Amino acid sequence: MELSEPIVENGETEMSPEESWEHKEEISEAEPGGGSLGDGRPPEESAHEMMEEEEEIPKPKSVVAPPGAPKKEHVNVVFIGHVDAGKSTIGGQIMYLTGMVDKRTLEKYEREAKEKNRETWYLSWALDTNQEERDKGKTVEVGRAYFETEKKHFTILDAPGHKSFVPNMIGGASQADLAVLVISARKGEFETGFEKGGQTREHAMLAKTAGVKHLIVLINKMDDPTVNWSNERYEECKEKLVPFLKKVGFNPKKDIHFMPCSGLTGANLKEQSDFCPWYIGLPFIPYLDNLPNFNRSVDGPIRLPIVDKYKDMGTVVLGKLESGSICKGQQLVMMPNKHNVEVLGILSDDVETDTVAPGENLKIRLKGIEEEEILPGFILCDPNNLCHSGRTFDAQIVIIEHKSIICPGYNAVLHIHTCIEEVEITALICLVDKKSGEKSKTRPRFVKQDQVCIARLRTAGTICLETFKDFPQMGRFTLRDEGKTIAIGKVLKLVPEKD
């Protein structure tokens, strides 16, 4: 069976994604090769390894399909990379190849793109929804689209690649299970994306910080005249990327998979391409379908970090369920404001459903709270198991990039799960030796680039957070300043407020 054609029964042909819910084949839950991606890797000596200690929390992904439909595993894929690497184009092409966007719609986009002299961008219009993005050809919000393979249901998070949009990218990465780093093989473009100031480095680092375990590197634009499906150019790009990705904390043998492709022609995305006989391995979509299952558990406490909210016959919140399961009619609490709410309705990837499990992207209609009383970064919890909230915490941080020294009193912007808040480093507690993990006996007066320290941080307002040990997804963070990611960190302990 072709991998991603809609399954047809009883002689029916055209089906919308909604109808096809009723028509899917039974898929065995216990897939061979299950288990978390990228476990048991050798300790690499890099700052990021220190971030990735025991993650025993159930992995935040699972799926409950609407009644009567078989279950497919939900996986969030974030496309990352430099601004013109071709992320949206690949996203659009995948939507087309898996039958989520039909030829007519694609041709309409192609015509509109031509009229605006944006010819090669037509595929990305399937993802870029608003006019401003289409005019600029840049993806600003995190675009959302989904496609299905035989065994899995994928949501594409198309994260922007422009420098000023990195905070949006962080939101995308914090919801992703899997990252696809799109690299342009075109002469000059690869170099721009990768050199200082290019987005490639920062995006890969953010994905790792956000807890993305598995990275697929698509070397795109292989059809470009400057590349012409050259194996040498492909290997050259690979060689330059591996040391960097290793430094960020990805294990090249277990966590990274490279493949060549062309987003514009669709070569090597769904079917093996004749252009690169030198590439042995599955094309992109079959490779995704055959990934081992993510370890998942529905028994954890309910945690749903809010990404966005709007008014529509009540208050609707958007987010990815990180842990636990939610059902219609359930009483929940919105933290940190301890607002009691009731679940009136649930949409999982725009399909109405009564119960959902971790990993699903949800729109939840709530009763008992106004839209203006909610901010991104708030968290929906079980009344009997609230998340922690506060302003002061101790954390281990790694200074990634900062020209000058950092002293107590330093201010930055904290990005933790879906929350963005101003933060001050109020005290430096000790330095941590990168290799041995030993802590210094004396308090440092300052820290500088590439050092690891334990520090006390205090946010401007109350935020929801957990220790990294208890809940990795809500205990890892980045610090940004002047448009750059300057540090990554993990929460070690919450410090109670003094009255």
From Swiss-Prot:
Residues 158-161 are annotated as: G3. PROSITE patterns: G_TR_1, G_TR_2. It is an enzyme of class 3 (hydrolase). Residues 72-298 form the tr-type G domain. Residues 220-223 are annotated as: G4. Disulfide bonds: none annotated. Residues 41-50 have a biased composition (Basic and acidic residues). This is Eukaryotic peptide chain release factor GTP-binding subunit ERF3A. It comes from Homo sapiens.
